Regions:
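Soluble "head" domains of membrane/secretory-pathway proteins
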Residues: 1-180
Length: 180
């Protein structure tokens, strides 16, 4: 079973002949939400687990729960949002905000690292473990939205695709009071 943060190959629940590769951002029993394009996670282990395992600057308190904001961004700097994708009514609202949900038993919540250009659990729900195929070793083939081959990604390991981000910018994310 995938752990939080793992990159996973799975069969698309709406069409089992299609394979997807996404990051498991929440597992059974976790609470997950999106606020202003930021992933929020309240692990099933609870508040003490959050305090013991995540940096204080990434934790916000809402009611009686501690939430981790963008829990994988520092460890996996390839996770990013596109600053050109804005909430102007033309883009899907799920990119920007999603009310908290509990991930059901035997399921996981998947998100692509290219957050604003990913067809993932925000749009079609959690993925049952029966659809999990495994972990990717390398990129066999890759193309963009225009069906152009991305030669710079072909035959690269998943780890080599991680790119550097400005960690100071991540620290400056303003946390608003409350999730919804």
């Amino acid at each position: 079973r995938p752990k939080r943060g793992d990159i996973v190959v799975f069969r698309y629940p709406k069409n089992e002949t299609i394979h997807y590769v996404k990051r498991a951002v929440a597992t059974a029993g976790d609470l997950v939400a999106i606020k202003d394009k930021h992933l929020l996670l309240h692990p099933k282990e609870g508040n003490e687990f959050v305090k013991a395992n995540y940096p204080k600057e990434n934790i916000v308190e809402v009611g009686d729960k501690l939430w981790v904001v963008n829990p994988y961004s520092k460890e996996h700097p390839g996770i990013h949002n596109d600053e050109n994708v804005v909430d102007n009514g033309l883009n899907p609202s799920e990119l920007f905000n999603m009310s908290p949900i509990v991930v059901p038993e035997d399921e996981t919540f998947m998100m692509g690292d290219n957050r604003d250009h990913s067809n993932d659990s925000r749009f079609w729900g959690t993925v049952n473990y029966k659809y999990i195929v495994g972990t990717p070793w390398f990129i066999y083939f890759s193309w963009d939205d225009n069906k152009e081959i991305r030669w710079d990604r072909v035959l690269k390991s998943v780890e080599t695709l991680e790119k550097t981000v400005d960690f100071e910018k991540l620290k400056k994310i303003e946390h608003q009071e409350g999730i919804y």
